[in-house]
Structure formats: C-alpha cells, structure tokens
Design a protein with these regions (language model features):
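Immediate flanking context of iron-sulfur cluster ligation sites
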Residues: 4, 31-61, 85-109
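Beta1-alpha1 glycine-rich phosphate/pyrophosphate-binding loop at the start
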Residues: 5-32, 41-44, 57, 68-82, ...
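C-terminal catalytic lobe of FAD-dependent flavoproteins
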Residues: 12-13, 18-37, 42-45, 365, ...
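Feature captures the FAD/FMN-dependent oxidoreductase FAD-binding
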Residues: 87, 149, 154-158, 206-255, ...
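Glycine-rich dinucleotide-binding loop and its adjacent helix/turn
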Residues: 131-149, 207-227, 250-314, 437-453
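Glycine-rich Rossmann-fold phosphate-binding loop(s) that bind the pyrophosphate
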Residues: 158-162, 299-301, 462
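FAD-site-proximal beta/loop scaffold in flavoenzymes
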Residues: 259-292, 391-467
Length: 494
C-alpha cells in the first residue's frame, strides 16, 4: 500500500449533500463529489489490513459481509490514492461492469466490513468507486466496442434490470449475440422505475445503455415475454435464454377496507411518478398524486423510505411510516459483532427530510394497520393502527410480532403506499417457458446453480434468489453469464 498510515493521518470526509429543505424542491440527485485531490486522501485511508473483509462477500448469519462482486477494494483504493484513475478503473472493471449504479444505490456492504471501521469511520469506498467511474466516463475510458470475434451463438435476456444488464454485458464481451427484452417502455427495470430519480438519475442509466448498444447489444422494449411473445418462440430462436424478470410480485396486506381507492403498491406509485417526469422531461411534476394529502407508508425498508422522500417532494401534508419491527439500537449489540452487517438504526434521506419538514421522525415502530375506512365515494379516509409486541411460539421457538389489545388508534389517511416487500417473480413468465417456481415463488434451479430444469433456460437476479440488492443482481447476472458461456463453448473465463 502506498500510504500505510493514511487511516491515522486523514479523517473520513464525504462529498457535499444538499440540505433537505433545498433538495425536496426537485427530483435531482443531491449527493455531490469531493474535489479530486480530497478524494485521493480518502483512498489513502485504506489500511494495509491482513484480511480485507471488504472484498470477501462472505455470508455470515444469513447476511453478506463485504462485496458480493468481490471487487478488489484495497487495490482500487490504493490506485485512487496514487491518482492513477485509469488503472483504478481497469482494476474495478475486472469484477464490476456497472459501478455507476452501485456507487449511488448500494448500502455499501464493503464499508460495513471495513477493518478501519472497527475503531474509526470506515474507508469511503462507495464514494471512491463513484469518483473512479465518473473519471472514466469524463475521460473516454468507458467504451462501447464490439467484440473482435463473434461466436455465432444467440442469447436472449428477459428483463433489463441490473441482473439482465449484467448478464447481457458479460455475454456480449465473450462474443455471443445478445438481445434484451423489456416489458416497459424504457430499459432499466428496477433501476428505471423502482428507484426514484433523486437517488439514481435516469441519465446515468441512459449513458450506460448507449455504451451497451455501441458494443452490439440489442434492446427490445414494450415486449412482455409470456404475453406479447411466447417462451416457445424464443426457445426456438435463441441458443440460450436467461430469465432476469426480477421479484416483481408485491406483497399485499389483507385487512378490511383494502379495496378503497387511494391505496397503491409502492412500486406502482414510484414508477408512475418517474414515468411522468421522464415523459415530460421533468417539466410536469405529478403533484396531484400526493399534494395536501396525509400519506401512510407501510414498510420500513428502502422502498418505504423512497416513498417518504417522493411524497414530500409531491407536497404531502403529512407522512407516517409504519415499521412492524422494534426500533434498532444506536450501536452494535454484542450478538452482532463485526464484520457482520451492523443491525443498527439507520435514518435515511427520506426520514431526514420528513424530520426537517414536519419536525419529527415519520416512523412508528412495532405498528401495523388493521383496517382502512372509506368515504362514501370509496376513497380511503383513515387507517386503524395497532401496536405490536414480540411473542415467542412455545412449539417452534420462533418470535413473531403480535397485536397488543387496547392499543388501536385511528389516523386520517388520504393516500396509502404499501412497501411490504415482494413475494417473488411473475408466474406467467416461468409458465411460458415451462419452468417451475419453488415454494418461495422464485424460479427453481438445479443444485443451487443458475440452470433450470430445461437445458436452454437459466435464471439470475431476484427472479432466482428473491428480493435482494442491486449489487447481488449484478453479481448473479455475471455468474449466470459464465454458466451460459460454459454451456455453449465448453469453457469460460473466470
């Protein structure tokens, strides 16, 4: 390492962030970058630690510790420190095809496993990664070049989310001819319509897609495979098909009044907002969806937080966010040691904005809804909430959250956004290809591989593993591409 004592000499410094009262005025990204020289010093903070857990991607207690892509984090950080941005990009590209996405939306599993984070703040690897890829784009290093030799093999990728794009990029590099099918009007899947623009500017996706097109990858939009096009057709036309349709089936809540008007699945709400912004070049903001309304967000995860931030930008009168689980501790518990993922309280951008705008945290912990009430016209007007407590099942030993009698309360509600996670993939896609779904409604695979029961059909991403992170989807797309390559050519490059 070029600066073994860098972690002692330099404090962590993050890029500038626009204050909540300013950033809620628009849907623009609000995380800036440090000047180049200051970013270099952040690379210098990477220690010469004996075991770099940051790049391990090891599963501990059911959660990933370190990067699932196995990015060579210490090497990239060292090259950043030396100001060798071109080689930093080359090194990062060996494992990662889309750093511009993860450097914006990843929870930074690498930083959670950083050795420096044991006694100080971890190395800002996520921001270093963003600096590297933005330098690469600005200096013409990211090129869409067609492979010199084509194999003559054709592969269809169903879905253009992070897993599908990753699979397509890696297969194309090996010389296979790749066509990506997307059911929506624009490429990007979850990246396009599941993540708000202020978190991932859609021009970032467009920039990458242009590179992929220049490299010879074809994209067909408004093509809902399983409905518009049959799986059998594609099986005949292509040598291999990879199903990367995501876990797009949202989990519902079944309570009285669920049929009231004004109750949305979060993914539909976020997608509607983004589509209208894109269709009008950000000139028309769909304020009518939430302006002046009391918004109830059900779910305390990332999507729920995105709903909070989006509702505030649309002029909501109030926002309440329900979280079934107890409030996480401020610091790690003894039962959650490093390098496990830290189960600690996180206040994300949406909650920060709610605190700034409304003067309080929008989250109600250990709370769920038991009923929605309607006006005469069928529109939702209130929600009945109840407090929960953990209770252990004596037979199984499992803890579950159960209602506490006498804790019901009613709050006014005009808009409900259900962000309770996803159950799995849409069944009609798998059915069209004649492949099975498992008990979790993910596509069933052979011996934990990416292969289904049919030789030509593989799967990757959330459609394979269930709802997960963008970084996992990219990793799965890459590994599934290797499996396809090996099945077609008899070998692949590791």
């Amino acid at each position: 390492m070029g600066k073994p004592t860098g972690f002692l000499e330099y404090e962590r410094k993050d890029g500038p962030v626009t204050v909540p009262k300013e950033r809620i005025k628009n849907f623009k990204e609000f995380h800036g970058q440090l000047p180049e020289e200051e970013q270099r010093l952040q690379g210098a903070r990477c220690m010469e630690c004996g075991v770099p857990f940051c790049q391990a991607g090891t599963m501990i207690a059911g959660m990933a510790s370190g990067c699932p892509l196995h990015n060579l984090v210490p090497e990239v950080n060292d090259l950043v420190w030396h100001g060798n941005w071109e080689q930093a990009y080359v090194r990062l590209s060996k494992t990662h095809c889309f750093p511009e996405f993860t450097s914006r939306v990843c929870p930074a599993l690498c930083e959670a496993a950083c050795t420096c984070g044991l006694h100080a703040k971890p190395v800002s690897t996520k921001e270093n990664e963003r600096a590297v890829i933005e330098y690469a784009y600005a200096n013409g290093l990211v090129k869409g070049e067609e492979p010199k030799v084509r194999t003559g093999k054709k592969v269809a990728v169903i879905g253009s989310g992070p897993a599908g794009l990753s699979a397509a990029w890696n297969l194309n590099k090996r010389g296979h001819s790749v066509t990506v099918y997307e059911r929506h009007d624009r490429v990007g899947g979850l990246l396009r319509y599941g993540i708000p623009n202020m978190k991932l500017d859609k021009s970032i996706i467009d920039r990458r897609i242009e590179v992929m097109k220049a490299a010879g990858i074809k994209f067909i939009c408004n093509a809902d495979v399983g409905k518009d096009i049959s799986g059998k057709e594609l099986e005949k036309e292509y040598d291999r098909v990879i199903l990367c349709g995501g876990a797009s089936h949202p989990r519902d809540i079944h309570v009285p009044g669920r049929d009231a008007k004004g109750i949305w699945f979060a993914v539909d709400f976020l997608g509607t907002v983004t589509k209208q912004l894109l269709d009008t070049n950000f000139e028309k903001v769909p304020y009518e969806l939430a302006k002046g309304k009391n918004v109830l967000v059900i779910g305390g995860g990332d999507t729920g937080n995105d709903c909070v931030g989006t509702s505030i930008r649309l002029g909501a009168a109030s926002v309440t966010q329900l979280e079934m689980m107890p409030k996480a501790p401020e610091c790690r518990a003894a039962s959650n040691p490093w390098p496990e993922w830290p189960k600690v309280l996180k206040t994300d951008y949406g909650q920060e904005e709610a605190i700034d705008v409304f003067g309080h945290d929008p989250r109600l912990y250990q709370t769920t809804v038991t009923e929605f009430k309607k006006k005469k016209d069928g529109t939702v007007c209130s929600a009945v909430l109840v407090s929960l407590e953990p209770k252990k099942d004596e037979k199984t030993g499992r803890l579950s959250m159960v209602p506490i009698e006498g804790t019901q309360k009613e709050i006014p509600v005009d808009l409900v956004l259900i962000a309770a996670g996803f159950l799995g993939s849409e069944g009609y896609v798998a059915e069209s290809f004649g492949v099975k779904l498992n008990a979790r409604t993910n596509v069933e695979t052979v011996n934990g591989s990416y292969r289904t029961g049919k030789e030509k059909i593989l799967t990757a991403g959330d459609m394979h593993r269930g709802q997960s992170l963008v970084v996992w989807a990219i990793a799965e797309g890459r590994e599934a591409a290797k499996e396809v390559d090996k099945s077609l050519m008899g070998y692949t490059y590791e």
